[in-house]
Every structure is written in C-alpha cells, then in structure tokens.
Regions:
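C-terminal coupling/interaction segments
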Residues: 242, 246-296
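Helix-to-loop junction immediately C-terminal to a conserved catalytic motif
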Residues: 51
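Conserved ABC transporter NBD signature motif
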Residues: 27, 58-73
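Catalytic Walker B motif of ABC-type/P-loop ATPase nucleotide-binding domains
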Residues: 151-155, 160
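ABC transporter nucleotide-binding domain
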Residues: 168-257
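ABC-family P-loop ATPase nucleotide-binding domains
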Residues: 82-138
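Walker A (P-loop) phosphate-binding loop of ABC-type ATPase nucleotide-binding domains
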Residues: 37-42
Length: 296
C-alpha cells in the first residue's frame, strides 16, 4: 500500500536555521496522527512543506504518490487549517462556507451548517470582526466539513474555550468513524487529544525524535517513586529521563521496564506510576535538548 505521505531526508533551511532537518516519515491512510512538539520545533514548517506551501531546501516529499508542489490534483485532496489563514477584507462567515466547495470536492454543506449551529456562529459577521475563538471555530468547520482525504489542523483550538474544544474533538471523532481519512493534528493540549491519536510524531529542533503508535508509547516509560536511596539503587545504570523530589521522596522517569524489573521495583518498596502522553513529550524533549546542549 502506498502511504498517503512519504518523505526522505526532508530539510527546510532559513539561512543557517534548519526548521525541518532530515525528516523521513510515512503516514498511512485513515489514521489520526498527532504532530507534537514545543513552539519553534518545526511543526508548522513541516505541515507547510507537506501541503506544498513551502519549498524544501533538500530531500523528497510524496503526497498521494507524487509531489504536492503546484499540483492541483493533489492539493484538492488536502485541507490545511492554520491560525494564520487570511481572507478578503469583506468576507463573512457565509462567504467562506459558500466558497469552500470550489476547493474541496467532498465538501458537505449539511454538516457545515450543523457545525455552525453547534458553535453558535453569526453567518453574516465579517471574518475580520470575529473573536479569536469564533475565527478558530470557522477553521474547525472548514476542516471537518471538507472531508478531505488528508486534513491538517495546526493548533485548531486557539481561542476556543474548554466546551468548544471538546465539541471539536467529539465531532472529529464521530465524523472520522463515518468518513475515515488521514488527519494530522498539531496541538499543545496533548492530554486533551491523547485518546484521539492513533500515532504520534514528536518533532524537536526540526528532527523527528518519536514516530510510534500511541498505545506503544503509553507503556514506554514509567515513574519510579520512593525513597531517594532506593530509587537511586534501582535506577543505577539506567537512562533517567527526569528526576525530581521533595525531601526524601524521589520520582524518576525511566524507560520501559520488564515484568521482572517491575516485580523487583515493588519488592524494593517502590511505587510505579503511569506517565501521561503530555508528560512523556515533555520528558523526551527535555532529554533531547540536553543531548543537543552537550554535543554543542
């Protein structure tokens, strides 16, 4: 099966800065991917490359088996929702929705209308007069109702309150079940979307440092909690991603443990606690940043 997206050694430089650095990934059809990483990690630049909005400095990109750059046949199958989207000054919400079918062959006007009601949007208000949350909601509606085979959401929640964000997640998951496609979701609110994501791509300093199914990641690290001496003895010789403590109590984040190692930890009086996806991302990017600093 040909992947929806395939890149090899993809790089985008701005002067001496490599915003995307040697990225090689393959994304399959009909999966929800999380593209995670802190600000400036390269998420938006990578998505811009994959949607033909940026030119690569070097490396190869294939989207639906061919280059996306200036390729109408590919781009009509792609929807990229980003915070910086611009519209003509006189455009109202209704104009955005009316023009959408020109760009997205699978556009569902009935679904779009239902979402407008869900988000309580004023159709006759100009885009430039919308609140940040309303502006984001319009993007969410376009991304969902486009039903594009490949849909990117770049920080779609900006300005949305908790209720509106949950509405987005619920509608995304329900519509994905009925109309499967490949969705790439970039967000900082990782724990909110953790149950949506089937696969995680973690980018840091322009490099992909994690490319794995979400279920596999959930058990890849664990917190070892207990007295300082006992934790130090147990973690001796292991890679410790993070460690902190209060008084004599210490928590150390370590890589996957075998069943025998888990038993040994408990026999030593240590407690093992799960690490959330958000904590995992933080720990891994901290670890990678430390490696970069040490090699500099």
């Amino acid at each position: 099966m040909t992947p929806v997206i395939h890149t090899r050694d993809l790089t985008r430089r701005y002067g001496s800065l490599a915003a995307v650095n040697g990225v090689s990934i393959s994304l399959d059809e009909n999966r929800i991917y999380g593209l995670l990483g802190r600000n400036g990690a390269g998420k938006t630049t990578l998505m811009s490359l994959l949607t033909g909005q940026e030119f690569a400095t070097s490396g190869d990109i294939e989207v639906f088996g061919t280059s996306p750059v200036e390729n109408a046949a590919v781009l009509q199958r792609v929807c990229f929702i980003k915070e910086s989207q611009r519209y003509p000054d006189d455009f109202k919400i209704k104009h955005v929705l009316r023009s959408a079918p020109w760009f997205f062959p699978n556009w569902d006007p009935d679904f779009a209308a239902a979402l407008v009601t869900d988000f309580n949007l004023p159709l006759n208000r100009k885009m430039k007069k919308l609140s940040r949350g309303q502006f984001s909601a319009v993007g969410v509606i376009v991304g969902l109702a486009s039903r594009a085979p490949l849909t990117f959401f770049d920080e779609p929640y900006l300005g949305l309150d908790a209720v509106a964000r949950q509405l987005f997640y619920d509608r995304l998951l329900a519509d994905y079940a009925d109309h499967p496609r490949t969705v790439v979701l970039s967000t900082h609110l990782i724990d909110e979307v953790a149950d949506l994501l089937e696969h995680v791509l973690l980018i840091d300093a322009g490099r992909i440092i994690v490319d794995a199914p979400t279920d596999e990641l959930r058990g890849s690290v664990v917190n070892v909690v207990g007295g300082r001496d006992a934790v130090d003895r147990f973690t001796a010789g292991r890679e410790v991603l993070h460690s902190d403590g209060i008084g004599g109590l210490v928590s150390a984040t370590v890589s996957r443990l075998t069943d025998a190692e888990r038993t040994a930890a408990r026999d030593a009086g240590l407690e093992l606690t799960a690490v959330s996806l958000q904590q995992l991302v933080v720990r891994l990017t901290e670890s990678t940043n430390n490696e970069f600093q040490e090699s500099a």
